[in-house]
């Protein structure tokens, strides 16, 4: 939550209103509830912030990656049937993913794992431009030492905010 809260503060300084789907370390259903909350708001965009893990115990994996929505017929939308494949939403999601990834790598110097597409529920069920960021690997002991640092959280939040502002500059009418 540290990076999310710092991002909120950065965006508020830019004059951007921020809706948090959670403000503490508690669970909010990621399959539909976060998207439902977002869809009921008047938000311009959605960012889901995570730290990665391979699930293989100790890992050598490193870096930051950003995801935007990829349709998969095996995973049909539950609450976003109308907008999940909307061309404008998808184009704006791709721009957001690229602007944020570029800013994160520039600010942190982390390994660039790239911008990828996936059918994650929070990306599928959210009716506005949406991305999911993975900010480093918690199961890599050396990377974990970096991502545990408050100063690194500050840099991540600054980069995320800059990526959002770059997106606003690139997308007309926002």
Model-derived regions: residue spans:
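Active-site-proximal helix/loop segments of hydrolytic enzymes
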Residues: 1-174
